[in-house]
Amino acid sequence: MDKENFTRLRGELFCDHPLARYTSWRVGGKAERFYRPADLFDLQDFLTQLPSDEPLTWLGLGSNVLIRDGGIKGTVILTLNRLKELSVVNSQLVFREKSGTEDFFSGNGKTIIRAEAGVTCAKLAKFCVSQGLEDGAFFAGIPGTVGGALAMNAGAFGGETWRTVIGVETMNHQGEILKRTPDEFKIHYRQVEGLENQFFIAGYFCFNHGDPDKAKTAINALLKKRNLSQPIGKYSCGSVFRNPPGDYAARLIESAGLKGKSIGNAEVSEKHANFILNKGNASAADIEALIHYVAQHVSQNHGIQLVKEVHIIGRS
């Protein structure tokens, strides 16, 4: 299936396309098909022309995913900088067909932002600062896109994505867009249930209006804290494991003596033990083996089974 099988496409379609460059670990095999839509409407056109049973994988910044060396079957859709609309919206127009929602959003001092899935969380944070929305600053610490943040309830510095969400737009395999509210999902720590073969394409976020200078100060303080504690600039996925209740994965890994542990060219960071680094030419197999090694040794040392935050996908 190549571009000749489609009509009206404005995006870019590739076959047997290498994926490593699209992940923050810089590892992974090829996609059978890889599509970069021109925009949301082009994505709809593309999906309506795919077979109904075509496997779909959605990729944003590639920062919370490990793609195995054997690559991915079916079609990979890249949202980063493609689904990129970001704007303040009229609160009275948000989900007005959903009974009762207008009343909830009619309070003074609230600002509603619509961000599409391919917008980076860093860009969303900067946009919040420009609008004087201090409680959106935590998004600066999430190394991903809005779509990924919605899918896993990403968080940083005490903030969580879904605490700010008042609505989402999802898309199914047929390219149909649905508007949904948070009560249609089960939201957990780093997990969201209820998507059911749909994909997040936009979120509506509600923030309190505040002082732009305070918002800028808040984001700068959070970024300084992140730079001091995390291996910024290295090939990693961010946090590999979720924090267990009442503890921190990094503390457990460090106390098990695993800082600096390597398998192949994958290494547990000396700076932050919940980060695994690609030292330059690691394979996905190296990284996956080290993930399992760390989880096994933490279990042996502490009796705690760490749960992966990173998603491992593709063929070995």
Swiss-Prot record:
Underlying gene: murB
A Pfam family annotated for this UniProt entry: FAD_binding_4
Pathway involvement of the protein, from the record: Cell wall biogenesis; peptidoglycan biosynthesis
The protein's name in its UniProt record: UDP-N-acetylenolpyruvoylglucosamine reductase
Residue ranges of every copy of the FAD-binding PCMH-type domain listed in the record: 27-225
Compartment list: Cytoplasm
Class of the enzyme per the UniProt entry, highest EC level: oxidoreductase
Lineage: Bacteria, Pseudomonadati, Pseudomonadota, Gammaproteobacteria, Legionellales
Catalytic-site annotation from UniProt: R190, S239, E309
Role description: Cell wall formation.
